[in-house]
């Protein structure tokens, strides 16, 4: 699970790998990677998503929410700026209402932007844990 979602290293930015979802299915002792989601833009897109194929009864699904972000600072091309507003556009960290409504049982969402793992079902978020305490990835 962790090795799949860690394709987004959690450092934010505009690279494609940081602006798409990764995930898969846990079936017994197997972890099956789902096709990565399409690249999104946190300034323009409401969300990004991943599609898990062939979900069976008893499967556990997991996916990431991207760390990508766009930071817009005031333009200082003409000289010194006093005041101004910096805007940050980023992806939602916690499971969305859609994630919760589509839960097939107990599912996992890895928030790559803040390193939190959300454990949730159709009733909502049941627990959170820092990813660094969840499991140590292969090196």
Task: Give residue ranges: language-model regions.
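Active-site-proximal loop/helix of nucleotide/amide-processing enzymes and allied scaffolds
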Residues: 44-139
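Glycine-rich short-loop/terminal segments
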Residues: 1-58, 123-124, 129-138
């Amino acid at each position: 699970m962790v090795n799949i979602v860690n394709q987004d290293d959690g450092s934010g930015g505009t690279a494609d790998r940081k602006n798409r979802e990764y995930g898969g299915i846990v079936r017994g002792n197997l972890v099956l990677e789902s096709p990565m989601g399409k690249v999104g833009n946190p300034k323009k897109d409401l969300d990004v998503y991943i599609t898990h194929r062939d979900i069976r009864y008893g499967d556990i699904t997991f996916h990431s929410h991207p760390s990508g972000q766009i930071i817009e600072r005031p333009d200082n091309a003409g000289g010194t700026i006093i005041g101004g507003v910096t805007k940050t556009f980023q992806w939602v960290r916690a499971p969305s209402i859609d994630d919760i409504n589509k839960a097939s049982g107990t599912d996992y969402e890895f928030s790559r932007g803040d390193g939190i793992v959300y454990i949730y079902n159709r009733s909502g978020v049941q627990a959170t844990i820092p990813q660094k305490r969840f499991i140590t990835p292969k090196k």
